[in-house]
């Protein structure tokens, strides 16, 4: 089974992430940031990842450290769960619509962290959630999972719909990329022989 648990403790946050990449989408989420919980639920359900996230952070200041550190810890957990990356498909992509919004996410488990984030949000906040924190979440994930990630919101008017399509597409792209390829069993998906 491809499971992992990672704990991250700093002076700003205490985070625990437990996941099963071959799950069914079950989740138990308690980050202290309700909108982040809603987005993590999209990753679990659409990525078919069993996901537990518990976070305690300095949200009395703002949600920045909690959101970023959850991204970091999730990236570490995914990297730990897939190990040497043998047999994975490596690449994944997804387009997801929600009413007027449409987003595309493309991921490569290349071992080279890189983020292209192009979401022209129509407002700065979704409820109390600062939309800029979504970039920090994905940057943290990318840097610690060792992936290249391209996120594009192709259209949208409602900022909630824009971000929800991003997280749903991310979950689906993640699922596709970490899926085991029977034809490449035991092989590193790279001509270099390593990722």
Swiss-Prot record:
Stored SUPFAM superfamilies: Ribosomal protein S5 domain 2-like
InterPro entries with a match to the protein in the record: IGPD_sf, ImidazoleglycerolP_deHydtase, ImidazoleglycerP_deHydtase_CS, Ribosomal_Su5_D2-typ_SF
GO terms of biological process kind: L-histidine biosynthetic process
Protein location: Cytoplasm
Pfam family, one: IGPD
Keywords per UniProt: Amino-acid biosynthesis, Cytoplasm, Histidine biosynthesis, Lyase
A single GO molecular function term of this UniProt record: imidazoleglycerol-phosphate dehydratase activity
A cellular component term, taken from the record's GO annotations: cytoplasm
Signal peptide segment: none
Pathway: Amino-acid biosynthesis; L-histidine biosynthesis; L-histidine from 5-phospho-alpha-D-ribose 1-diphosphate: step 6/9
EC number: 4.2.1.19
Keyword hit for Transmembrane: no
PROSITE patterns per UniProt: IGP_DEHYDRATASE_1, IGP_DEHYDRATASE_2
Domain of life: Bacteria
Catalyzed reaction equations: D-erythro-1-(imidazol-4-yl)glycerol 3-phosphate = 3-(imidazol-4-yl)-2-oxopropyl phosphate + H2O
Family: Belongs to the imidazoleglycerol-phosphate dehydratase family.
Protein name: Imidazoleglycerol-phosphate dehydratase
The species this protein was found in: Burkholderia cenocepacia (strain HI2424)
Phylogenetic placement of the source organism: Bacteria, Pseudomonadati, Pseudomonadota, Betaproteobacteria, Burkholderiales
């Amino acid at each position: 089974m491809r499971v992992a648990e990672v704990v991250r403790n700093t002076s700003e946050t205490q985070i625990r992430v437990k996941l099963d990449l071959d799950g069914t989408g079950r989740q138990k989420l308690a980050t202290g940031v309700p909108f982040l919980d809603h987005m993590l639920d999209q990753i679990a359900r659409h990525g078919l990842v069993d996901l537990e996230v518990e976070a305690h952070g300095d949200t009395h200041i703002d949600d920045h450290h909690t959101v970023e550190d959850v991204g970091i810890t999730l990236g570490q957990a995914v990297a730990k769960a897939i190990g040497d990356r043998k047999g994975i498909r490596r690449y994944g992509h997804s387009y997801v619509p929600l009413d007027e919004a449409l987003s595309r996410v493309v991921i490569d488990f290349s071992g080279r962290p890189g983020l292209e984030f192009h979401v022209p949000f129509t407002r700065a906040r979704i409820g109390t959630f600062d939309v800029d924190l979504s970039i920090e979440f994905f940057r943290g994930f990318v840097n610690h999972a060792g992936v290249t990630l391209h996120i594009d919101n192709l259209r949208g008017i409602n900022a909630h719909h824009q971000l929800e399509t991003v997280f749903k597409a991310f979950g689906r792209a993640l699922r596709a990329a970490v899926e085991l390829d029977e034809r490449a069993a035991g092989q590193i998906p790279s001509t270099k022989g390593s990722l």
